[in-house]
Amino acid sequence: MEHVVYVVGHKNPDTDSVCSAIAFAYLWNKWKEGGNVAKMMKIEAEAKPVIQGDVNPETKYVLEKFGFEVPEIMTNGEGKKVALVDHSEKAQTVDGIDKAEVVAIVDHHKIGDVTTPQPILFVNLPVGCTATVIKLLFDKTGVEIPKDIAGILLSSILSDTVIFKSATTTELDKEVAEELAKIAGIDDLTKFGVEIKAKLSAVDDLTAMDIIKRDYKDFDMSGKKVGVGQIELVDLSLIESRIDEIYEAMKKMKEEGGYAGIFLMLTDIMKEGTELLVVTDYPEVVEKAFGKKLEGKSVWLDGVMSRKKQVVPPLEKAFAEL
């Protein structure tokens, strides 16, 4: 087994999964030099951040702004030591995970189905962003946060919490963001957040499938394969002319992939709501989950900003009741 720990986020990487991998790899290597963590675990392998796919324009912008290279792509973990950030589900992790050695998991989602034969470093907190958890690990273990790392951690929080508008946002996320902003030299969090999110609103050069897959995850919902994607926009008018094209691509994806349903969240950051595009064999799950009957291709969900907290749980419950 290689003497390297590959720190990796989920498939279809977003800003939090990429930047958290970079920041946690940096932190791990600081732990390797000594300090409090050595009292708990022996660290011999050097950490290296990797990603499972191409970065989106928002992440690319953040990395360039704070002087980081895009990490290498690694999709198979067989025979490798890996640390998982921003996920703990097999469907979202590297191939060959059962033949990898998982040495750490740092996350903010529900606990997934990745298991280990021995105890590991496992930190999972109910906050809005994995970057928030990593910042706390820096503090708890007495490692100073450099300006560039502070910048990407802050960007991750603003991205994942949708500038603190997402239902997943906690007061701790806001406090941590303020502390990181001071280190990174960012004065106006809202302005910087809009600057970041605007990069994801550029969809003209994307294919319909690119839009669906930009921030997309597969789920097993009571034995049924369900996909939920999300694209965040500063204005839904930017994508209105593409709806029919996207819908047809979703139908094709559903048929070819054996899905019970594919749901695409078109989230309007400024209006604070989501137009949910739906292709499913079970249209009744929409009413069960959200209290609104599906008429046509989509349904508007006022105040819905978070896939993790406001879309996936009610869908899981609805599919379980079929």
Curated annotation (Swiss-Prot):
One of its GO terms (molecular function) is inorganic diphosphate phosphatase activity. Gene3D superfamilies: DHHA2 domain (3.10.310.20), inorganic pyrophosphatase (n-terminal core) (3.90.1640.10). It comes from the Archaea. It catalyses: diphosphate + H2O = 2 phosphate + H(+). It is an enzyme of class 3 (hydrolase). The keyword Manganese applies. Mn(2+) 1 binds at H10, D14, D86. GO terms for cellular component: cytoplasm. Its EC number is 3.6.1.1. It is found in: Cytoplasm. Keywords: Cytoplasm, Hydrolase, Manganese, Metal-binding. Mn(2+) 2 binds at D16, D86, H108, D160. Disulfide bonds: none annotated. The keyword Ribonucleoprotein does not apply. Its cofactor is Mn(2+). HAMAP family: PPase_C. This is Probable manganese-dependent inorganic pyrophosphatase. It comes from Archaeoglobus fulgidus (strain ATCC 49558 / DSM 4304 / JCM 9628 / NBRC 100126 / VC-16).
